[in-house]
Amino acid sequence: MVLESTMVCVDNSEYMRNGDFLPTRLQAQQDAVNIVCHSKTRSNPENNVGLITLANDCEVLTTLTPDTGRILSKLHTVQPKGKITFCTGIRVAHLALKHRQGKNHKMRIIAFVGSPVEDNEKDLVKLAKRLKKEKVNVDIINFGEEEVNTEKLTAFVNTLNGKDGTGSHLVTVPPGPSLADALISSPILAGEGGAMLGLGASDFEFGVDPSADPELALALRVSMEEQRQRQEEEARRAAAASAAEAGIATAGTEDSDDALLKMTISQQEFGRTGLPDLSSMTEEEQIAYAMQMSLQGAEFGQAESADMDASSAMDTSEPTKEEDDYDVMQDPEFLQSVLENLPGVDPNNEAIRNAMGSLASQATKDGKKDKKEEDKKEEDKK
């Protein structure tokens, strides 16, 4: 990389108050100087940059230094005043370059001219010949008063370059929103192949210079916007899904709580309606009640697992089920099998046998009674 010491000459005349460059010429110049300083120091860490004003006394604000922060802090203290003296400012910058510490550094002057140059063309050409002899390159950014200055400054740069030289440049920038953008794409900051000296991919949005490839920069910007919209949509969907899951979990908890409450109430009602005074019952009545409770418990479990939509149909069939249950309870063989499977119950116990016998005799009587009623109904029909 080229080792270079650069003096930046800034225009601080009254013309810099104009607003043809946003927000003013002076502030647009500050942004451009910022880019120049960073470009020079990043291209080579050993490069040095100094700062000098062109108006009135051509004051040297900072001598050659690699500290861009120091340069920029001095730059922001500059206020518009008076008129520029272009030739004097260039001579002072040349003297500052002669006192550079690194004698192997090439010398370069970058001058911002935003005011009319009052020096005549002969003086400019004479100064250019002297600088060429000293091997000093000069880059000029001509803006704001390009109609007045372009001819003089072109003669100055052409004299510096000679017939074959290309070390010095003149960049004329028409009024526009950004002086810095025009400078980035200019030969002053462009190396071989158009690469920006000291400006990596991180200095441009999406890593692409919009002036070098505007179509690619636009495509990347559109793609980035679409990606941002997709991410926002996915975030909204995820938030909605999380809210829906939370709502389902809450509803499920409420449903389970309601079911548990209903079951508890049903069990309490069942206990109140079906719990007689066991102390007043005989042993045979207690055994019969135990068998009845086991049957009712089975029916209760089946009723809890049944579909709620069939409740009306179940209500209409309750008399039939009660008759079937009564018939089952009066079946001695079924009761005998139930007693044999009950733990701690001896089917051969005398009390159990007596209870079974009484149930059997009752069943026989009921059967005969039902038969008589059926015969009587048939006779009435005849």
Curated annotation (Swiss-Prot):
Residues 224-252, 301-382 are annotated as: Disordered. There is a cross-link at residue 122 (Glycyl lysine isopeptide (Lys-Gly) (interchain with G-Cter in SUMO2)). Residues 216-220, 287-291 are annotated as: Essential for ubiquitin-binding. InterPro entries: PSMD4, PSMD4_RAZUL-like, UIM_dom, VWF_A, vWFA_dom_sf. SMART domains: UIM, VWA. The modification Phosphothreonine is found at residues 250, 253. Component of the 19S proteasome regulatory particle complex. The 26S proteasome consists of a 20S core particle (CP) and two 19S regulatory subunits (RP). The regulatory particle is made of a lid composed of 9 subunits, a base containing 6 ATPases and few additional components including PSMD4. Interacts with NUB1. Interacts with SQSTM1. Interacts with UBQLN4. Interacts with UBE3A. Interacts with UBQLN1 (via ubiquitin-like domain). Interacts with DDI2. Belongs to the proteasome subunit S5A family. Component of the 26S proteasome, a multiprotein complex involved in the ATP-dependent degradation of ubiquitinated proteins. This complex plays a key role in the maintenance of protein homeostasis by removing misfolded or damaged proteins, which could impair cellular functions, and by removing proteins whose functions are no longer required. Therefore, the proteasome participates in numerous cellular processes, including cell cycle progression, apoptosis, or DNA damage repair. The 2 UIM motifs are involved in the binding to a multi-ubiquitin chain in a cooperative way. This is 26S proteasome non-ATPase regulatory subunit 4.
